[in-house]
A protein has these predicted regions:
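Acidic, low-complexity, intrinsically disordered interaction modules
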Residues: 19-71
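N-terminal acidic leader/helix
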Residues: 3-26
């Protein structure tokens, strides 16, 4: 698993490489099974994560929200 900065995760979303699921409310917001391939951590713990679906689509949680605990 690779470590990213929150800025890197946000740039992946801005460039269209990853889909933003920061404010997702349920697991079904990602319509396929996925695995975690990266994370962003700071002094208060996990601040973001990068997920990869079985189709190859990337999903990013770019802020410290409840989506970190859902996924």
């Amino acid at each position: 698993m690779e470590r990213y900065s929150c800025k890197q995760l946000k740039s992946l979303v801005a460039s269209g490489v990853a889909k933003d699921v920061t404010y997702a409310n349920k697991r079904s917001d990602i319509p396929e099974s996925y695995t975690q391939i990266g994370y962003a951590a700071g002094i208060y713990g996990c601040n973001g994560m990068l997920l990869k679906g079985e189709s190859g689509q990337l999903y990013a949680v770019t802020d410290r929200t409840s989506a970190i605990y859902i996924f």
